[in-house]
């Protein structure tokens, strides 16, 4: 009951944000052309906003599923008006590239977008793994294709987090012992969950809010591991031992952009 109440408050909050912002930057249009992110955890917010806009009397087309780099270009040229899946600061560069034609408007969730790397708790405890660098000595434990490197589910091409992950790889030399898997994220995570259920070790990037850490419970099934150095203003969260973990990613604001 308490969880349901929390969900209802969240829904009311989303609708109130739409009303407050009034979509002033696209209200001149006869039709609002919506986009949505190509990660499935963004579908829910997009649908809530679409229905709220329609209740306010707007005609809404879409949402059209798009990668971030595609959305911001399309929004700058007027091919699409709005999406509610902006992650700022990860997406700050896209805003700069739009030269003022696309801007964040309102908030879905302030500082609610955490990102980072997780491994199965069993392996973390067995090998004493605290950071991504600790993977190096035990990379074969996550090697699925026999190349000697740990296979880690990462971000598909075109996602903002792909650039942050690449920065970590460049700064820390992670490519020497980790292979980033950039296939469809949902399909890759379905494979991760299947492996975990079959007793195999898993290593993956994820973010919150996300169904992945609902299925694989934080502190029970999986734990965050630290990025010991990064130029990002890294978010910190408690892990299973209540210590603080430097995630290597900033805590993003999830915001509409139009």
Language-model segments: which ranges?
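Short, polar/charged alpha-helical segment
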Residues: 40-59, 167-169
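A conserved helix-loop-strand patch within extracytoplasmic ligand-binding domains
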Residues: 102-154
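C-terminal lobe and pocket-closing loops
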Residues: 212-258
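Short helix-initiation/N-cap motifs at beta->coil->alpha
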Residues: 39-40, 58-73, 180-191
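Ligand-binding pocket segment of bilobal, Venus flytrap-like solute-binding proteins
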Residues: 74, 80-84, 155-230
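N-terminal segment of the mature folded domain
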Residues: 69-121
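Short, well-ordered beta-strand elements
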Residues: 30-41, 58-63, 149-153
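Sec/Tat signal peptide C-region and signal peptidase I cleavage site
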Residues: 23-29
């Amino acid at each position: 009951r308490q969880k349901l109440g929390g969900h209802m408050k969240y829904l009311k909050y989303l609708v109130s944000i739409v009303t407050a912002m009034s979509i002033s930057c696209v209200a001149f249009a006869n039709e609002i052309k919506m986009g949505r992110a190509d990660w499935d955890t963004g579908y829910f917010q997009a649908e809530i906003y679409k229905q709220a806009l329609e209740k306010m009397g707007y005609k809404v087309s879409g949402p059209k599923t798009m990668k971030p780099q595609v959305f911001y270009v399309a929004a700058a040229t007027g091919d699409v008006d709005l999406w509610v899946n902006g992650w700022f600061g990860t997406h700050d560069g896209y805003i700069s590239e739009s030269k003022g034609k696309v801007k964040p408007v309102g908030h879905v969730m302030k500082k609610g977008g955490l990102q980072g790397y997780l491994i199965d708790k069993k392996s973390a405890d067995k090998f004493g793994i605290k950071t991504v660098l600790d993977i190096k000595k035990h990379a074969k434990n996550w090697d699925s294709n026999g190349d000697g490197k740990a296979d880690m589910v990462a971000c598909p091409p075109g996602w903002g987090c792909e650039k942050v992950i690449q920065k970590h790889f460049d700064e820390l030399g992670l490519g020497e012992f980790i292979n980033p898997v950039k296939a469809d994220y949902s399909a890759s995570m379905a494979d991760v969950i299947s492996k975990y259920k079959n007793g195999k070790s898993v290593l993956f990037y994820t973010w919150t809010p996300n169904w992945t850490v609902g299925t694989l419970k934080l502190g029970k099934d999986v734990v965050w591991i630290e990025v010991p150095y990064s130029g990002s203003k890294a978010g910190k969260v408690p892990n299973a031992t209540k210590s603080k973990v430097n995630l290597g990613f900033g805590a993003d604001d999830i915001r509409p952009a139009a």
